[in-house]
Amino acid sequence: IDRSRGLGDVYKRQHKEAAKRETFEELGVQSRDINIIGPLTPLYIPISNFKIFPFVGWLKSAPKLNIQSKEVSKVFSPSIYSLTDPKTKKIKDSILLGQKVQIPFFNLKNEVVWGATSMILSEFKKILKGIT
């Protein structure tokens, strides 16, 4: 899943190309190797003032990654099974800006995935559950 911010892009095709471009810039995956399945729901992130236009895509084989450490802190590949397993979705009580909040996150392969990525994965998980 690439979370292309798509700033200034208006049309879905532009967002799709932006997602492929971001995937290349951040991970080194050639855009010609990415088969886009389709878009997920755009997501506005108030804290960063970005609107994210996520897409789901697939690759025919495992890519040789060239990770840009300024953009990507870690890459791991959880299985579809672990993503759809109800035990991997968790909620943490926290304080944010003086308010009690519940923060949803995934624990996948002992990696915590939260924030915008968690929200995007939640939608993807719902789609997967609808087709399995």
Predicted feature locations:
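Single conserved hydrophobic/aromatic residue that forms the stacking wall/gate
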Residues: I1-Y11
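Unchanged
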Residues: D9-W114, S122-T132
